[in-house]
Structures are given as structure tokens and as C-alpha cells.
From Swiss-Prot:
The modification Phosphoserine is found at residue 440. SUPFAM superfamilies: Protein kinase-like (PK-like), SH2 domain, SH3-domain. The modification Phosphotyrosine is found at residues 30, 187, 389, 500. Residues 56-116 form the SH3 domain. InterPro entries: HCK_SH2, Kinase-like_dom_sf, Non-receptor_tyrosine_kinases, Prot_kinase_dom, Protein_kinase_ATP_BS, Ser-Thr/Tyr_kinase_cat_dom, SH2, SH2_dom_sf. This is Tyrosine-protein kinase HCK. Interacts with ADAM15. Interacts with FASLG. Interacts with ARRB1 and ARRB2. Interacts with FCGR1A; the interaction may be indirect. Interacts with IL6ST. Interacts (via SH3 domain) with ELMO1. Interacts (via SH3 domain) with TP73. Interacts with YAP1. Interacts with ABL1 and ITGB1, and thereby recruits ABL1 to activated ITGB1. Interacts (via SH2 domain) with FLT3 (tyrosine phosphorylated). Interacts with CBL. Interacts with VAV1, WAS and RAPGEF1. Interacts (via SH3 domain) with WDCP. The gene is HCK. The keyword RNA-binding does not apply. The lineage of its organism: Eukaryota, Metazoa, Chordata, Craniata, Vertebrata. It catalyses: L-tyrosyl-[protein] + ATP = O-phospho-L-tyrosyl-[protein] + ADP + H(+).
């Protein structure tokens, strides 16, 4: 980081960022991430104590992947290396290698506590049933590929998910509840009980014993993204190299860029004057706290005009462009409904956090290389200072996606986002066709006042169209919640059957 010098947080005294600026007046200022919290580990003042790793309170972690240090404050390690945690600080922890005794920062999502389930390749922590299905059905897996995950419904319990094949449905995933014995053991069927999950896995690898398939190999998992650089929230423009223009919107451009020569990112450049720096920074600090795997991750900001918004890079671009592409236009209906379910999941999180998107449409959904849909630009609409966008007569106002009460009275709520989601469903099922084809904005407003709603496209199932029509109820309070919409879309093809298999 050039002119940064390493300082570590000290319990009880003044706190220093890892990347505090030096006295050099030309050194660009890095401002810490507003969401990071610091927890000194039990060994933080124990630096030279012999036998670290033997105390009862020590947090010993093992590396799940290799990591090559980018900065001199970081600690390189190989898969399988063990380290003692000195300080838990957001996504980067300070640790000491038990082998080399070297200290430095490590990405916390690259390690797991020794002897924890997370060290097992078949254990997927905190993954939902639906995401388990998405991952097991992804390329690279086979019949009998499996994972054990935390139960969504019963805290402290687990579920087994297995890839299967059904002549009618094709590739599918079956789920089994793993039940717990009073003595701490585990079973799927009461006739076969095990003292550990490892024993359970070994047993069902030898034979299916009533499961749909014999367990073959753990579900393929990719190395997680490294956490964003520690304490790099407000960053200098010079740290970014804009490389390829990905698109241009009403308020700026989107670029593929490299941060500090090592991290691929997307950069949204805002036209000067499109928003006040103070309002933007206040909103960005709030947006930074909204972290969910179906929301585009906000990494950093440049707060001098022109404002830059730095986010994770999404390889397939906007959902709108993807749906119109050769690859997107070949996606079958179940995949389109899966896209819709992913977006509903992200919006259910926004709803739960009492936040509002205000500009939900296919152009503001981004698609990853593995076809994960993530919501982008949440909250930005609120701070735009452009009458062309904020006034309903303005050329940039997204009339066709906007709920009547937001058009007429300017009142945006999560229920107006639900209306927009109904329009977004129509965009998805028509592969990116503009809503209300052939109608101008004033014609749309007049038609809505008469009670007009877009008709059902030929390829759209009645049940999906019913969701759209519920999203377009005139009275906002009669529209469904995103939580409800997510539950319907998640189980769109399986609502009539039990999600979990009966005991074998």
C-alpha cells in the first residue's frame, strides 16, 4: 500500500488502523470500513509465551486453502497449516503460524477451527436447502455427490443433501434430516446410529442403506473470494486502473477495473453533480452494512467527484443484457424461475432489514459466472439529484417499473419494490423484453389508472402470472411480502411434495 505503516489495535488504549497513514502529506488517505469490529483474541498479549496452542482458551485454526500474502502485514499459508488467532477483526484476523511463528493478517473465510466440522470437505456451513440444490446440480458434480449442512429449521441439527437422478425429473437433489440421539450421536434411520457425522458419512459411502444413492464425493466447492482489503473503505482514485467499459447508464458508466494491481472489481463512475458527496457517503455507509450473498458486495468508495462505487465483479453483467444474449436466451423456464427466486431471496433480506431498493429491475440485477443473481444499486435512487430522474415527467424516471403510489405521491416503500418485482418477473419470463411493449410512459400511467395489467405471455405458467398479479395489486398492503414470494418461487416445482425424504 505504498506509504502505509502497520499498526495494531491495542486493548484499552488508542486504536490504530492496520493502514494508518504516515506523515507523508502526499500519501492518499484510506478510511476504515464502517462495518469492521475488533475483538482481541485470548492470545493478543501473549506474543512471546512459549507453548502457544496448548492453552485451553487458544483459538487454533487450520487453513482450508492456500493463501499468498499480498501485503507485508499479511501471513502466507498452505492448506493444512495451523495458526493461533491473536485478534479477530472483521474479515481479517491477526494470527501466528504454529510452524514458523510468523505473525500477520489472514482472511478469516480461508480457515476453520481445528477439529470443527468446517474442516471436512463435505460440510457446508450456513447454506440453505435451495442453495444446496443449486450447488449440487452445478457442473462438476455426479450421482451421489453430497453435502452435510446446518438445518434451516432446527438449530444445532443437520441435513444431508444428495444428488440423485429421476427418469421423470432428470437430475435432482434429495434431502434427509439427520436426527440427534440423547447421548449426542446421529442417525438418519433409527436402525443405523453413529457417534459422529464422520462415521455416518463413512457408512453411507459403503452403501446407500435406504438412501436414494450411495454417497460418492463431496459437492464441488470453489475457493471463496478473498475478503476485501482491511481498512480500505474510502480509497484513493489512483489505486484503481479502469480497464474495460462494461456499460453506460443514466448517471455514469460501469467499468471492469483492477484495484492495487491485484484485485478485479467493477467500478461505477457517477457523473459529477448527480448526487451530493455527503448524502452519498451516508447512504454508502448504510449500504455497506447490508451484506448477503444475493446482494452485490460493496467494497469501497472514492468520495471526491466524480464519485466511484467499487463492487465485486460479476462476469455475466446485468441480467437484462444476459437474458438477451445467446446464452441467456437459451435458459429453460426452471432456470428463469430460479433467477427469480434468488432475487426474491435478496429482496427478502432487504425487507427484513427495513430497507428499500427504489429501482428494482433487470438492469440492476447482476449475474455471476456460475449464474448467481445479485441485486445491485440498492438505495442509490434515493440520493440522485437529477430532476429528469426524480420527477415523474422526467425522461429518466423508470415509470414502467414504478408502483402507482410512487408515481403519484412519490411514496416509496418495500411494497412499491414488490410492484417492481412483478415487472421484473415479466422481464425475466420474456427474456428481457421491455415492459408494456409499444406503450409510452403517459400511456402506461393512464392504462394503470384504468386498471390495466400486462397480459400473461404464452410461455408463462399460470402460477407465476398469479404472483405477478398479486404484486400489482392497487393497494400496497394487499401485495405479498418478499419472504412469501421467495418461499413460493423456491418451491415452485416441488410445492406438492415433501422437501425431506422419509426415514429410509
Amino acid at each position: 500500500m505504498g506509504c502505509m505503516k502497520s499498526k495494531f489495535l491495542q486493548a484499552g488504549g488508542n486504536t490504530f488502523s492496520k493502514t494508518e497513514t504516515s506523515a507523508n502529506p502526499h500519501c492518499p488517505v484510506y478510511v476504515p470500513d464502517p462495518t469492521s469490529t475488533i475483538k482481541p483474541g485470548p492470545n493478543s498479549n501473549n506474543r512471546n509465551t512459549p507453548g502457544i496452542g496448548e492453552g485451553s482458551e487458544d483459538i487454533i485454526v487450520v487453513a482450508l486453502y492456500d493463501y499468498e500474502a499480498i501485503h507485508h502485514e499479511d501471513l502466507s499459508f498452505q492448506k493444512g497449516d495451523q495458526m493461533v488467532v491473536l485478534e479477530e477483526s472483521g474479515e481479517w484476523w491477526k494470527a501466528r503460524s504454529l510452524a514458523t511463528r510468523k505473525e500477520g493478517y489472514i482472511p478469516s473465510n480461508y480457515v476453520a477451527r481445528v477439529d470443527s466440522l468446517e474442516t471436512e470437505e463435505w460440510f457446508f456451513k450456513g447454506i440453505s436447502r435451495k442453495d444446496a440444490e443449486r450447488q449440487l446440480l452445478a457442473p462438476g458434480n455426479m450421482l451421489g455427490s453430497f453435502m452435510i449442512r446446518d438445518s434451516e429449521t432446527t438449530k444445532g441439527s443437520y441435513s444431508l443433501s444428495v444428488r440423485d437422478y429421476d427418469p421423470r425429473q432428470g437430475d435432482t437433489v434429495k434431502h434427509y434430516k439427520i436426527r440427534t440421539l440423547d447421548n449426542g450421536g446421529f442417525y438418519i434411520s433409527p436402525r443405523s446410529t453413529f457417534s459422529t457425522l464422520q462415521e455416518l458419512v463413512d457408512h453411507y459411502k459403503k452403501g446407500s442403506d435406504g438412501l436414494c444413492q450411495k454417497l460418492s464425493v463431496p459437492c464441488v466447492s470453489s475457493k471463496p473470494q478473498k475478503p476485501w482489503e482491511k481498512d480500505a473503505w474510502e480509497i484513493p482514485r489512483e489505486s484503481l486502473k479502469l480497464e474495460k467499459k462494461l456499460g453506460a447508464g443514466q448517471f455514469g458508466e460501469v467499468w471492469m477495473a483492477t484495484y492495487n494491481k491485484h484485485t478485479k472489481v467493477a467500478v461505477k463512475t457517477m457523473k459529477p453533480g448527480s448526487m451530493s458527496v455527503e448524502a452519498f457517503l451516508a447512504e454508502a455507509n448504510l449500504m455497506k452494512t447490508l451484506q448477503h450473498d444475493k446482494l452485490v458486495k460493496l467494497h469501497a468508495v472514492v468520495t471526491k467527484e466524480p464519485i466511484y462505487i467499487i463492487t465485486e465483479f460479476m462476469a455475466k453483467g446485468s441480467l437484462l443484457d444476459f437474458l438477451k444474449s445467446d446464452e441467456g436466451s437459451k435458459q429453460p423456464l426452471p432456470k428463469l424461475i430460479d433467477f427469480s427466486a434468488q432475487i426474491a431471496e435478496g429482496m427478502a433480506f432487504i425487507e427484513q432489514r427495513n430497507y428499500i431498493h427504489r429501482d428494482l429491475r433487470a438492469a440492476n440485477i447482476l449475474v455471476s459466472a456460475s449464474l448467481v443473481c445479485k441485486i445491485a444499486d440498492f438505495g442509490l435512487a434515493r440520493i440522485i439529484e437529477d430532476n429528469e430522474y426524480t420527477a415523474r415527467e422526467g425522461a429518466k424516471f423508470p415509470i414502467k417499473w414504478t408502483a402507482p403510489e410512487a408515481i403519484n405521491f412519490g411514496s416509496s416503500t418495500i411494497k412499491s419494490d414488490v410492484w417492481s418485482f412483478g415487472i421484473l418477473l415479466m422481464e425475466i419470463v420474456t427474456y428481457g423484453r421491455i415492459p408494456y411493449p409499444g406503450m409510452s410512459n403517459p400511456e402506461v400511467i393512464r392504462a394503470l389508472e384504468r386498471g390495466y395489467r400486462m397480459p400473461r405471455p404464452e410461455n408463462c405458467p399460470e402460477e407465476l402470472y398469479n404472483i405477478m398479479m398479486r404484486c400489482w395489486k392497487n393497494r400496497p398492503e394487499e401485495r405479498p411480502t418478499f419472504e412469501y414470494i421467495q418461499s413460493v418461487l423456491d418451491d415452485f416445482y416441488t410445492a406438492t411434495e415433501s422437501q425431506y425424504q422419509q426415514q429410509p
